[in-house]
Amino acid sequence: TFADNMKMPIHKWYRYTAGFSASWVNQLIRQEKTNGRTRIIDPFAGSGTVLLESEFEGVESFGVEAHPYIYKIAKAKLDWNFPADKFKSEALSLLRKAKAKTITKTEFPKLIASCYPIEIIQKLEALKQTWLETEQEEEIKNFNWFIITSILRTTSPIGTAQWQYIQIGRAHV
């Protein structure tokens, strides 16, 4: 199951419940390599499990993901080897700019307003606006988007069900 991935580098960056075990994928890739197969086509790439494991095993891979949100997650994960020091300085710069931004808007869509306190919504909005306004290299911009997306669950006091659906009225425990 994908739950196993939450202990693995890169795979644990995003909890994708529709995914499957990276260890199992790696085992299959190694097995097929012994049969001389060194190319993989994944028509449902999801969050990139097969593509990442292919890269780790030196196997050429191609993936297709139709959902734009999930595609962006996979793309950010596949850029995992971007220089960490450069990313860190860019991410901290983005955060500093967002902290300096004042959001006065208080009206947000009902679903958003029911999932987050107004102070959190305004901070998230500042992050989003700063991200949209900031020019960055594509890999860094994608990864910063990924980080902002990844904190949405933890910044909300609303709980989630097993399949990540929101549960209004249930708090994180």
PLM regions: where:
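S-adenosyl-L-methionine
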Residues: T1-N35
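Conserved class I S-adenosyl-L-methionine
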Residues: G36-G46
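Short intrinsically disordered, low-complexity coil segments enriched in acidic
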Residues: T1-D4, G46, P157, G169-V173
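Class I S-adenosyl-L-methionine-dependent methyltransferase module
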Residues: F56, E60-H172
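Conserved SAM-binding loop of SAM-dependent methyltransferases across substrates and taxa
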Residues: S47-V59
